[in-house]
Amino acid sequence: MKRAILLSISILFLGCFFGKAQTAQKETSPSGPDKIEAYYFHFNARCETCRAVESEAKAYILGLYPGRATFKAINLDDASSKPIADKLKISGQTLLVVRGDKQINLTNEGFMYATSNPDKLKAVIKQKVDGLLVR
């Protein structure tokens, strides 16, 4: 009986690892004119709201635009983040959606709604990103 349970748990863990690898590949490989890149810039010290902005925005953007969107959380305290922060002109915590040379800053909405009204945040993300795709 113990062997059967151990075998079942092992198979479950293997399935989790392989499933995540495939999902990660899909999330990082959109291409074409409708490609959307979402960035959440943050620092090492993060409050509950900061974490909620990242998790809610990531879930919504990748869920609303599967195969067309990427989401990257970038720590501004890491020296390796300087080139992308400079390119996008970011100096502080920011939730940014980019398509080509067009940008939408969703920082205010993210911090306003991530914990208090996540459905409103999803609606705002959809409205603004859909508008970006039409351009």
Where are these regions (language model features)?
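Bacterial Sec-dependent N-terminal signal peptides
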Residues: 1-26
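Structural micro-motif
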Residues: 86-100
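Loop/turn elements at helix/coil->beta-strand transitions in domains of secreted/extracellular proteins
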Residues: 35-36, 66-70, 91-93
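Thiol-based oxidoreductase modules, predominantly thioredoxin-like and allied folds used
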Residues: 66-81
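Local sequence-structure signature of Cys/Sec-based thiol-disulfide redox active-site neighborhoods
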Residues: 31-63
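Solvent-exposed, acidic/flexible segments
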Residues: 34, 46-50, 54, 78, ...
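Non-catalytic, surface beta->alpha helical segment in thiol-disulfide oxidoreductase systems
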Residues: 97-135
